[in-house]
Protein backbone atom coordinates (compact mmCIF):
# COMPACT_ATOMS: atom_id res chain seq x y z
CA UNK A 1 0.00 0.00 0.00
CA UNK A 2 2.93 2.35 0.52
CA UNK A 3 4.81 1.78 -2.74
CA UNK A 4 3.94 3.31 -6.10
CA UNK A 5 6.01 2.76 -9.24
CA UNK A 6 9.49 3.78 -8.10
CA UNK A 7 11.18 3.82 -11.54
CA UNK A 8 8.40 5.87 -13.16
CA UNK A 9 8.04 8.08 -10.08
CA UNK A 10 11.71 9.04 -10.55
CA UNK A 11 10.93 9.97 -14.15
CA UNK A 12 7.92 12.00 -12.99
CA UNK A 13 10.02 13.89 -10.42
CA UNK A 14 12.31 14.90 -13.30
CA UNK A 15 9.38 15.71 -15.64
CA UNK A 16 7.84 18.03 -13.07
CA UNK A 17 10.99 20.19 -12.91
CA UNK A 18 9.91 21.55 -16.32
CA UNK A 19 6.63 19.80 -17.20
CA UNK A 20 5.96 21.13 -20.69
CA UNK A 21 9.47 20.56 -22.03
CA UNK A 22 10.24 17.36 -20.14
CA UNK A 23 6.98 15.64 -21.04
CA UNK A 24 7.80 16.17 -24.71
CA UNK A 25 11.26 14.70 -24.13
CA UNK A 26 9.73 11.71 -22.34
CA UNK A 27 7.30 11.15 -25.22
CA UNK A 28 10.15 11.40 -27.74
CA UNK A 29 12.08 8.73 -25.80
CA UNK A 30 8.97 6.54 -25.56
CA UNK A 31 7.80 6.71 -29.17
CA UNK A 32 11.08 7.31 -31.03
CA UNK A 33 13.87 6.14 -28.72
CA UNK A 34 16.58 7.61 -26.52
CA UNK A 35 18.81 8.23 -29.53
CA UNK A 36 16.30 10.86 -30.76
CA UNK A 37 16.80 13.07 -27.70
CA UNK A 38 18.93 16.21 -28.10
CA UNK A 39 21.15 15.01 -25.24
CA UNK A 40 21.40 12.14 -22.79
CA UNK A 41 18.96 12.57 -19.91
CA UNK A 42 19.92 10.35 -16.94
CA UNK A 43 16.35 9.91 -15.62
CA UNK A 44 15.12 8.71 -19.02
CA UNK A 45 18.19 6.62 -19.77
CA UNK A 46 17.87 4.80 -16.44
CA UNK A 47 14.15 4.17 -16.90
CA UNK A 48 14.26 2.99 -20.52
CA UNK A 49 17.31 0.82 -19.90
CA UNK A 50 15.18 -0.92 -17.26
CA UNK A 51 11.97 -1.38 -19.24
CA UNK A 52 13.54 -2.21 -22.59
CA UNK A 53 14.89 -5.48 -21.18
CA UNK A 54 12.51 -8.27 -20.23
CA UNK A 55 12.86 -9.55 -16.65
CA UNK A 56 14.39 -12.99 -16.13
CA UNK A 57 11.02 -14.56 -15.31
CA UNK A 58 9.40 -13.41 -18.57
CA UNK A 59 8.32 -16.23 -20.90
CA UNK A 60 7.36 -14.96 -24.37
CA UNK A 61 5.66 -18.24 -25.31
CA UNK A 62 3.28 -17.99 -22.33
CA UNK A 63 2.43 -14.43 -23.26
CA UNK A 64 1.74 -15.49 -26.84
CA UNK A 65 -0.54 -18.30 -25.60
CA UNK A 66 -2.45 -15.83 -23.41
CA UNK A 67 -2.84 -13.40 -26.29
CA UNK A 68 -4.14 -16.16 -28.54
CA UNK A 69 -6.70 -17.04 -25.84
CA UNK A 70 -7.95 -13.45 -25.75
CA UNK A 71 -8.36 -13.54 -29.53
CA UNK A 72 -10.46 -16.70 -29.29
CA UNK A 73 -12.78 -14.96 -26.83
CA UNK A 74 -13.72 -12.39 -29.46
CA UNK A 75 -16.14 -9.67 -28.40
CA UNK A 76 -17.21 -11.75 -25.37
CA UNK A 77 -13.84 -10.95 -23.82
CA UNK A 78 -14.43 -7.24 -24.31
CA UNK A 79 -17.88 -7.41 -22.72
CA UNK A 80 -16.54 -9.38 -19.76
CA UNK A 81 -13.74 -6.85 -19.27
CA UNK A 82 -16.12 -3.89 -19.45
CA UNK A 83 -19.17 -5.26 -17.67
CA UNK A 84 -17.58 -7.53 -15.10
CA UNK A 85 -13.94 -6.64 -14.49
CA UNK A 86 -14.12 -2.85 -14.74
CA UNK A 87 -17.63 -2.32 -13.37
CA UNK A 88 -16.98 -4.62 -10.41
CA UNK A 89 -13.68 -2.91 -9.70
CA UNK A 90 -15.28 0.53 -9.82
CA UNK A 91 -17.54 -0.46 -6.90
CA UNK A 92 -14.67 -0.43 -4.38
CA UNK A 93 -14.34 3.15 -3.09
CA UNK A 94 -10.99 2.80 -1.30
CA UNK A 95 -9.40 1.21 -4.30
CA UNK A 96 -10.81 3.91 -6.58
CA UNK A 97 -10.04 7.04 -4.59
CA UNK A 98 -7.67 8.34 -7.29
CA UNK A 99 -10.47 8.03 -9.87
CA UNK A 100 -13.00 9.61 -7.52
CA UNK A 101 -10.81 12.56 -6.49
CA UNK A 102 -9.66 13.33 -10.04
CA UNK A 103 -13.23 13.06 -11.38
CA UNK A 104 -12.25 10.27 -13.76
CA UNK A 105 -15.23 8.16 -12.67
CA UNK A 106 -17.84 10.90 -12.65
CA UNK A 107 -16.95 13.44 -15.33
CA UNK A 108 -14.79 11.24 -17.53
CA UNK A 109 -16.13 7.70 -17.12
CA UNK A 110 -16.64 7.16 -20.85
CA UNK A 111 -13.18 8.49 -21.65
CA UNK A 112 -11.69 6.29 -18.93
CA UNK A 113 -13.42 3.20 -20.34
CA UNK A 114 -12.27 4.06 -23.86
CA UNK A 115 -8.66 4.51 -22.68
CA UNK A 116 -8.72 1.21 -20.83
CA UNK A 117 -10.24 -0.54 -23.85
CA UNK A 118 -7.56 0.91 -26.14
CA UNK A 119 -4.85 -0.29 -23.74
CA UNK A 120 -6.44 -3.77 -23.67
CA UNK A 121 -6.51 -3.93 -27.47
CA UNK A 122 -2.90 -2.74 -27.61
CA UNK A 123 -1.55 -5.32 -25.16
CA UNK A 124 -3.44 -8.24 -26.67
CA UNK A 125 -1.79 -8.05 -30.09
CA UNK A 126 0.91 -10.53 -31.02
CA UNK A 127 4.40 -9.09 -30.51
CA UNK A 128 2.81 -6.07 -28.85
CA UNK A 129 5.52 -5.81 -26.19
CA UNK A 130 8.40 -5.37 -28.60
CA UNK A 131 10.05 -2.00 -27.96
CA UNK A 132 8.09 0.35 -30.24
CA UNK A 133 4.91 -1.70 -30.59
CA UNK A 134 1.60 -0.58 -29.14
CA UNK A 135 1.50 -2.85 -26.08
CA UNK A 136 4.88 -1.59 -24.91
CA UNK A 137 4.22 2.10 -25.55
CA UNK A 138 0.66 2.00 -24.17
CA UNK A 139 1.77 0.27 -20.98
CA UNK A 140 4.64 2.68 -20.39
CA UNK A 141 2.31 5.61 -21.08
CA UNK A 142 -0.24 4.27 -18.57
CA UNK A 143 2.58 4.07 -16.02
CA UNK A 144 3.42 7.69 -16.86
CA UNK A 145 -0.17 8.87 -16.35
CA UNK A 146 -0.44 6.92 -13.09
CA UNK A 147 2.79 8.54 -11.87
CA UNK A 148 1.44 11.98 -12.83
CA UNK A 149 -1.78 11.34 -10.89
CA UNK A 150 0.24 9.99 -7.96
CA UNK A 151 2.46 13.10 -8.03
CA UNK A 152 -0.57 15.43 -7.99
CA UNK A 153 -2.53 13.48 -5.37
CA UNK A 154 0.46 13.39 -3.03
CA UNK A 155 0.28 17.21 -3.02
CA UNK A 156 -3.50 17.26 -2.50
CA UNK A 157 -5.13 17.86 0.87
CA UNK A 158 -7.89 15.46 -0.26
CA UNK A 159 -5.55 12.46 -0.28
CA UNK A 160 -5.48 10.56 3.05
CA UNK A 161 -2.28 8.56 2.85
CA UNK A 162 -2.85 7.00 6.29
CA UNK A 163 -6.12 5.47 5.08
CA UNK A 164 -5.47 4.80 1.37
CA UNK A 165 -1.70 4.45 1.22
CA UNK A 166 0.28 5.71 -1.76
CA UNK A 167 -1.98 6.75 -4.66
CA UNK A 168 -2.17 4.00 -7.31
CA UNK A 169 0.01 1.74 -5.19
CA UNK A 170 1.36 -1.73 -5.93
CA UNK A 171 -1.42 -3.45 -3.97
CA UNK A 172 -4.11 -1.66 -5.98
CA UNK A 173 -2.26 -2.46 -9.20
CA UNK A 174 -2.15 -6.14 -8.21
CA UNK A 175 -5.92 -6.07 -7.61
CA UNK A 176 -6.40 -4.52 -11.05
CA UNK A 177 -4.29 -7.29 -12.54
CA UNK A 178 -6.44 -9.90 -10.78
CA UNK A 179 -9.59 -8.25 -12.09
CA UNK A 180 -8.24 -8.21 -15.62
CA UNK A 181 -7.04 -11.80 -15.50
CA UNK A 182 -8.94 -13.89 -12.97
CA UNK A 183 -12.31 -12.21 -13.45
CA UNK A 184 -11.93 -12.58 -17.22
CA UNK A 185 -11.37 -16.32 -16.79
CA UNK A 186 -14.37 -16.59 -14.45
CA UNK A 187 -16.51 -14.62 -16.88
CA UNK A 188 -15.76 -16.84 -19.86
CA UNK A 189 -16.84 -19.87 -17.84
CA UNK A 190 -20.26 -18.35 -17.15
Model region roles, listed by residue range:
Residues 1-190:
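Mature, function-bearing regions of proteins
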Amino acid sequence: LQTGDIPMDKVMAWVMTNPRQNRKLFETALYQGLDQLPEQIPALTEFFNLVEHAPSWFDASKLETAIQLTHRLGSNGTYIMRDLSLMTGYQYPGFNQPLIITGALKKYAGKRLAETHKWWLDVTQLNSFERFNSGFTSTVYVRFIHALVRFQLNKSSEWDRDVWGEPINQYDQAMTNLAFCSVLLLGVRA
